[in-house]
């Protein structure tokens, strides 16, 4: 069997998780051919997992120039995602990027333009697109059977993190290291799913609290209101300070309501779409007939393994990706807009003013408090990325 020779850049939480999946033979068409990390302890760990003969590099460019790999998986701090992706494109390597696509959209736009010029496969690690509930939810919305979207609401507060999480790396939860908090670290999956299913809004009014629940400088509590081109509205609420948290994604449409919660999808279907019912009904307190359904799904949620297997299939046979790399800019547009709205203290419109966003971000980077004397900790992330 032909295999994709993968080089992993960054052997931290996510990089080591991918290695674990590949070692367990969950990705039969992928082999780890080399790894790169600036931390010698992580290279030693990789050798212990993959064998003493594993080619290890302390320089990602050297690994990319080695001729040992066909593709790279970029799993490093956020600011460097576009940089290494573009280095890969220049060398004709296929590229898979961990979320988020980057920190600011102007940077990611450059990455996308470079990808368009390269004849390679470019994917994003949006593993939650493999979730059976969200796939089914999107299929129903996109089919048009329930009509136009009227309202969206996502309460996603089960991203709880204790202070120890933020203390596990000097770059964590800093403007200079991560470029943001819960929106850029935990919620890229949710923001991607929100726009993947409902589309991008045209107006964003966000209220962010910075270091509300933790000793950090970035946001850990968010409440956002959005408006869509068709007049629909939406809310997005998230936090890393709630325990227990909630995860309820609700979409109201002309013909009913979809609710994703607890790994299940429910549908409240109207016998007559609301606009038509309101027009023809003559009873002052009349209501359309409503039926409630538990929506069946295929039950499959292949997560990171599914994304990597699709990546290999795209390289070897031209099969579709779970998420094309160019799509990473969409969810990032939402988080950038939320940050900018909060910083300016007013709503912002899309398309985003990328220059203004970058200027405001750099103000915060210049005064960022880089943590010192921090002992980096690599944690087991398995079980933390399921239905969200």
Model region roles, listed by residue range:
Residues 1-51:
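N-terminal Rossmann-like dinucleotide-binding module
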Residues 53-60:
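Conserved SAM-binding strand-loop segment of SAM-dependent methyltransferases
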Residues 71, 77-129, 144:
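Beta-strand-loop-alpha-helix segment that lines the small-molecule cofactor/substrate pocket
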Residues 223, 250, 254-326, 348, ...:
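C-terminal glycine/acidic-rich active-site capping loop/insertion
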């Amino acid at each position: 069997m032909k295999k994709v020779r993968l080089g992993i850049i960054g052997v931290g939480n996510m990089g080591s998780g991918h290695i674990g999946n590949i070692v367990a033979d969950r990705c039969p068409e992928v082999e780890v051919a080399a790894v790169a990390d600036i931390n010698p302890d992580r290279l030693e760990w990789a050798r212990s997992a993959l064998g003493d003969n594993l080619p290890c590099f302390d320089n990602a460019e050297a690994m990319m120039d080695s001729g040992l790999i066909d593709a790279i998986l970029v799993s490093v701090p956020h600011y460097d995602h576009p940089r290494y992706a573009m280095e890969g494109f220049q060398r004709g390597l296929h590229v898979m990027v961990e979320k988020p696509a980057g920190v600011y959209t102007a940077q990611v736009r450059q990455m996308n333009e470079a990808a368009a010029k390269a004849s390679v496969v470019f994917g994003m690690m949006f593993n939650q697109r493999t979730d059976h509930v969200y796939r089914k939810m999107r299929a129903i919305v996109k089919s048009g059977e329930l009509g136009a979207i009227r309202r969206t609401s996502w309460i996603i507060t089960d991203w709880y993190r204790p202070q120890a999480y933020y203390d596990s790396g000097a770059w964590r939860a800093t403007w200079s290291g991560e470029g943001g908090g819960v929106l850029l670290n935990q919620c890229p999956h949710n923001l991607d799913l929100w726009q993947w299913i409902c589309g991008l809004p045209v107006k964003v009014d966000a209220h962010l609290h910075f270091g509300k629940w933790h000793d950090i400088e970035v946001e850990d509590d968010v409440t956002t209101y959005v408006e869509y081109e068709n007049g629909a509205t939406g809310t997005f609420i998230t936090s890393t300070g709630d325990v227990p948290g909630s995860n309820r994604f609700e979409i109201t449409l002309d013909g009913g309501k979809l609710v994703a919660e607890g790994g299940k999808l429910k549908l409240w279907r109207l016998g007559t779409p609301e606009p038509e019912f309101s027009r023809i009904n003559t009873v002052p307190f009349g209501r359309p007939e409503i039926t409630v359904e538990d929506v069946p799904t295929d039950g499959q949620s292949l997560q990171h393994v599914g994304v990597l297997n699709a990546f290999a299939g795209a390289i070897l046979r031209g099969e579709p990706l779970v998420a094309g790399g160019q799509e990473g800019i969409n969810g990032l547009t939402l988080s950038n807009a939320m940050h900018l709205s909060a910083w300016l203290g007013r709503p912002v419109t899309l398309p985003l003013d990328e220059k203004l966003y970058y200027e405001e971000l750099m103000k915060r980077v210049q005064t960022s408090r880089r943590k010192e004397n921090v002992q980096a900790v690599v944690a087991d992330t398995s079980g933390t990325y399921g239905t969200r």
